[in-house]
Amino acid sequence: MNYPLKSLKIIFIFLLIVAQFPASVVASEYASEIFYKIRTESNSSSESIGSYSKGCLSGGMYLPSHAEYYDVLKPSRNRFWGHPDLIEFIELTSEQIFNEFGNGLLIGDLSMPRGGPMPYGHKSHQNGLDVDIYYEKKPEFQMDRFKLETYNPKSLLSPNQREINYKLWTDYQYDLLKITSKNDRVARVFVNPLIKNEICKIAIKKGDTDWLKKIRPWGGHYKHFHVRLTCPEGSKDCINQAPIKQSDGCGIELQSWLQKDKVFESNSTKIKEWMLLSELPNSCKNIIRD
């Protein structure tokens, strides 16, 4: 069928408008909704982009749900993706813990397949460099899919959340945090302020405080601690946090946390959905279309 030239021009202009339409719609959507809907990794090279709380992940790797040295809880959330450095860190650390203590690790959330803001649970975990690790040891029995989804690790705090539960606290938790924080890749380890206070008391008594500065007090974090790695080589658009002060963090700063309600803050804070894709680094727009 032959179309008049004028009609062809109209069709061409219409197609140009339609081609641009998805981009304009995506730019106005909440970023958490966009990234949550993407169920697979991007095809581009591995890079952590932007900051931990305003970024995305290129070429993410997934962490298998089962391994000899660890299990990943709640795999249906699809938050088991990270930069290759993070995946390697988890694999090597869990193997080290197994070799030294005879138990594996329970792993919580990493990032979504392409990072980005999550609709609930975390404000960070956006650029593939954050992981939650539980204080509780990996059970000796084989965890099936149902167990991985429903297993609920115990809190290290007492039921009133005002002190350490010494029925659960052992030297293992102290050693686990020490091994983790002394890793050169680790930038920070976030723990509940009461847990930071406990390890400060033990470390000061032992004269073993050189590793404490990376252990940062933060609300919640009574079932798990949050490990954050430094920006990897080759991730030119990754933004590190400011350097930590040369202090063990057991003084005035910690005391201010212990006096605040933040000690008892829930781990399941609802995330505001106001962050738009346009607020993330420009590279993130390409990542969602890759």
Where are these regions (language model features)?
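Bacterial N-terminal signal peptides that target proteins for export
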Residues: 2-12
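Extended, low-complexity, intrinsically disordered C-terminal regulatory tails
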Residues: 34-37, 89-121, 190-212
